[in-house]
Amino acid sequence: MHDNGSDSTLYLFWHDPDAAAPAEFDLHGDAHPMDDGMWLIRSELTRSKLYHRLKWQLPDDTSIMLAPLFDDPAGWPKFKGMAEGALAWLRGS
């Protein structure tokens, strides 16, 4: 779901933080960490393609979640106590 003037979609991605993510974890887009195992990602990939590309980099039994978000200030998630710079990243600052 996008309304940011581009072909990218904003996603919320979470994986079990106890899973060993690779040192060079490719998030396939512009991304910002929110917390251990949680990222906001803007990607031109479809949800299915992004989900599988992220899943294949993690151990087989890792719990994961990928959800599209409406990429407009009115649709951004509300949050507190997340990684520094997350709101600035959303705003493009």
Question: Which role fits each region the language model picked out?
Answer:
Residues 2-4, 48:
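Long, contiguous binding/interaction regions
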Residues 10-27:
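Short amphipathic alpha-helix segments
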